[in-house]
Amino acid sequence: MSAGRGTKPAPRSGNRTPKQRAGDAAEQAALHHLEAHGCRLVARNARYPEGELDLIVRERDVLVFVEVRMRRSAAFGGAAASVDVFKQKRLARAAQHWLLQHCGQRWPACRFDVVCVQADGTMEWIRNAFAA
């Protein structure tokens, strides 16, 4: 896939804040987890005015938009609860932009997943986390 609007290379380690570095590490851990389960990376950190798509992977014939969430504790519902309806709508609009840019009018089967990375390194992969 060519670099351009809506894509960027793997996370940088330069002048990143500790929170950004932790987020980069969570995304990388989530990607390894997904790849270990047969997914193939299509794009990462695709940015649009509506928001950022953390990971885009292909699982068999399905294009999967993956939101990676990291939380230090399960307080306030944990990582999964932080993907509220507002965030879901932003992700859906960003995904529409990505699909139009990369797939034109022939959209593949798609879904939205959430990978929750806990502070202790455990992960929960929520397939079909929400519908758009």
What are these regions (language model features)?
Residues P49-G51, D120:
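Short acidic/glycine-enriched loop/turn segments that link adjacent beta-strands
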Residues A46, R69, A129-F130:
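Residues forming the ATP-binding cleft of Hanks-type serine/threonine protein kinase domains
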Residues L41-A43, F65, F112:
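Hydrophobic residues on conserved beta-strands that form the core of alpha/beta folds
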Residues G4-G6, Q101-A132:
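Domain-level recognition of nuclease-like catalytic cores that cleave nucleotide substrates
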Residues M1-R44:
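Acidic-basic catalytic patches of nuclease active cores, encompassing PD-(D/E)XK
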Residues A92-G104:
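Metal-dependent nuclease catalytic cores in nucleic-acid-processing enzymes
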Residues L34, L53-G78, V83, L91:
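Conserved catalytic cores of phosphodiester-cleaving nucleases, focusing on short active-site segments
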